[in-house]
Amino acid sequence: MSSSSFVWTVGSIALSSLITPTIADGSGSRYQLTEAWQGEKFLDHFKFFSGSDPTNGFVTYANQSYAESSGLIEVTESGSFYMGVDYKTKLSPNGPGRDSVRIESKEYYDEGLYIIDLQHMPGSVCGTWPAFWSVGPNWPYDGEIDIIEGVNKHEANEIVLHTSGSCSLSSENDMSGTMSSSECGESSGTIGCVVKGQTGTSGAPFNEKNGGVYAMEWTSSFVKIWYFARSEIPQSITEGNPDTTAFGTPMAHLQGTCDFGERFKSQKFILDTTFCGDWAGGVFGDSGCPVSDPSNPIQSCVNYVAENPAAFKEAYWEINYIKLFQTGTGHSTASIASQAETATAVVSKTVDSVPSVTSTPILETTAPAPETVSAEAPATSSAVPEPANPQTSVAGAETTAAPAPSPETTAAPASPSSDDSEGADAVSETTIYVTETTTICGASTQKGTIQTIGGGETEVSPASSTVESAATPAAPTPTSQEPVASLPGTTVNDGTPVPTDVSPETPAEETAGESGAPTPSAEQPEKPQPAATSIETGIVPPPVSNPAPTEQGTPEGASPVDATESRHVPDEPAPTSAAPIRSPSPSSWTISSSSRVALSSSFASTTSSASRTTSATKEATAPTETDSGASTGTNPESPVFTAGASKSVGISGLAGIVCGIAMAMLA
């Protein structure tokens, strides 16, 4: 690969990691669908209100089970949602009110575009007070928006806003409705600012035209509400990409000196039908409804509602859908995920292109649940690992770059929770991250040459002799770099050690699940550590637990690696090329919470089962000789970097990559 091509590849890393996620939408609309409430799943977004009516209505709100069993709610054959009232039972004016339903959204919502498609709304019936509205958690300070509301023989929708203090609107805004009050604040009492729509936008005339659509655009500067008859619904709405700039003149354009961003906070949506109460009962006599007690319009309303159940058969909502749109949120998650995949894929391609770097086929370990072999001995004895077959053929070093994840790769299952019950095998994970590759030049050990592969991994030249298994403890391998736990080497195919590296940010105390293994003996050697064990192709012995840093460091004379369980992994066919060992996660590429890009292939994640404690002291590293005389070197760990951008590859890291690769190419 030419130097210029490599530079372009490195440049693509920076671009893919630094570009801010954008809206992945090619349409002209700036609104993206976030939620759709309809059909069988309509009620998934609502909870039932069954308390006393806050507006003092003559009503009994049903809970969900009663509403379903009594037929007050149902999903129709056409897929619409029906929500009605009891229209069969004659009541006593002095008893409980008429059964009805009030549902409230489970969540609160912010500024956006909200569209409701109604096949039917409660008709123009005396005593009714239907409403579709929203309200903040702290009324009136967080505001209230009445999108659809009417009482008694209503035929024109009334849009009302309520908030605290003084909130004045302009009546000069272009709108089809008529503003009768411009003060939304509580200084005007409970009236609020009111815009009344044209006749036919509510009640019986609305239903006679096969219903229609209401749309509300709520921003920090204004609230606009449109009404569209069934035959006049904009094409952008029917196509699912609403464009408010093409909606035309709204029924209500609510804007003025009022700060909407401050006065109207997160809102929940409410759909209900009540009877009489403060408004419908208060104006009952002025609406052309029968008055039984001229001195008490509210009591006249209650009398009518109690004694005339059949009048309320048309007092129902039939909703085709409610859709929620917000600016640029519909695809943002997918965009971020796509960006992460792009960044990691480019990193893999760059590392694959490094010349003169060889890798040995590495088997992938699928865990947890391998067999645990331990000595059947009293509690004073320690777990003994079952040695693998020491006869291993030496394979020549292949000049094959570590491949990107392929369908052949078997993903390791997710590690169990730390809350697993006692007796379960806990699997800890360590992820090796893309690091600054300033250690590309070869390093020498006592018996053999170690070539730096990257990320702290090493490779011994094929001249190294086959390492035989050793079940006896070996002396620990201290380190001269930043605290890194030395792990026992394992050999695969050609006797090449498979090093295990650990990030400095390994959790301080990660307790493994107990599988009944005996505890270590007090007579155990002072610094126990299993030596390297060679294995047959297809069997990968698990690594010894990775020590985690401690504040005090390792006491002098103490072993940096505690006695661990031995875990035997079932045979698995070896991949034809170098296969990555991945951490237990849904995919082979991960973006960690510490803003590092995890790299697959030979930069491997390893799993282990043991208590983990790592020395925080700085000690010198020396190669460990095996029984056969081959040396297993511990390569200095490459520094892990955190870039300035929260999820980007650092510029300093890129400079290190370029310098390191240039040195390797010149060599």
UniProtKB/Swiss-Prot annotation:
Cellular compartments per GO CC: plasma membrane; side of membrane
Keywords attached to this entry: Carbohydrate metabolism, Cell membrane, Cellulose degradation, Glycoprotein, Glycosidase, GPI-anchor, Hydrolase, Lipoprotein, Membrane, Polysaccharide degradation, Signal
Residue intervals of the GH16 domain: 25-288
Database matches in Gene3D superfamilies: 2.60.120.200
UniProt main location, coarse: membrane
Gene Ontology annotations of biological process type: cellulose catabolic process
Disulfide bond positions: none
Enzyme class: hydrolase
Region forming the signal peptide: 1-24
Polar residues bias: start-end ranges: 354-363, 379-394, 623-637
Membrane topology: Lipid-anchor; GPI-anchor
Lipidation residue positions, type GPI-anchor amidated glycine: 644
Protein name, per record: Probable endo-1,3(4)-beta-glucanase AFLA_105200
